[in-house]
């Protein structure tokens, strides 16, 4: 059995999240700790991080939702912290409910109070998200169109899922972004899905 189980940016990718969490709990020793790190729903909504929303992600988690998932899986969250990864993530620390050897930490209570005060469990918390996302899309398109009108060449670095989500949402094509550079040889020579922007080796940037 494991004394420490680390699952960074895994939960959001799992379609059967309670089943997965149950499996994690079964791997822990009696006093073992599991840590789960994932993009924090509070930051996703507050900053209109729509580029985090794509086909690989099945869940977008708050602390309150994570506590409910882990409770259903026979685990208990005893601590949590907010971290800056991916524009704002949450790292939760959990133990088996039959362990009961760790008290809840103040950081957990603080994040729980934050989410309750923001009303993450109500639909009002999510109102305005679409408008904020549309504004980001509009501003990006305006920037690229202005650059084109000024005779400037725009390229991108990193053929990642988030960037691809942003470009497709804004309707950006090769006429506005000529190419995207990436160091992954498996991507070089390919095209971004949807936008069809070619991917070149990062040496092109130098």
What do these predicted ranges mean?
Residues 36-59, 63-66, 70:
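Short, glycine-/aromatic-enriched active-site segment of Class I SAM-dependent methyltransferases
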Residues 8-10:
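Short catalytic micro-motifs in class I SAM-dependent methyltransferases
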Residues 75-86:
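Conserved S-adenosyl-L-methionine
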Residues 3-6:
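A conserved beta-strand element that flanks and buttresses the S-adenosyl-L-methionine
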């Amino acid at each position: 059995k494991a004394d420490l189980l680390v699952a960074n940016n895994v939960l959001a990718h799992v379609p059967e999240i309670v089943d997965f969490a149950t499996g994690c709990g079964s791997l822990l020793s009696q006093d073992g700790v599991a840590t789960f790190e994932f993009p924090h729903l509070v930051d996703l909504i507050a900053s209109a991080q729509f580029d985090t929303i794509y086909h690989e992600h099945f869940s977008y988690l708050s602390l309150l939702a994570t506590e409910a998932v882990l409770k259903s899986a026979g685990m208990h969250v005893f601590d949590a912290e907010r971290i800056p990864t991916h524009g704002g993530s949450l790292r939760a620390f959990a133990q088996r409910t039959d362990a009961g050897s760790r008290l809840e930490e103040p950081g957990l209570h603080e994040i729980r109070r934050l989410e309750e005060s923001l009303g993450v469990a109500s639909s009002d918390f999510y109102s305005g998200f679409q408008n904020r996302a549309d504004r980001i899309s509009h501003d990006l398109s305006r920037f690229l169109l202005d650059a084109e009108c000024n005779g400037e060449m725009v390229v991108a670095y990193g053929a990642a899922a988030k960037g691809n989500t942003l470009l497709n949402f804004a309707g950006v094509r090769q006429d506005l972004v000529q190419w995207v550079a990436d160091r992954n040889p498996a991507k070089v020579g390919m095209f971004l899905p949807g936008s069809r922007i070619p991917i070149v080796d990062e040496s092109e940037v130098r």
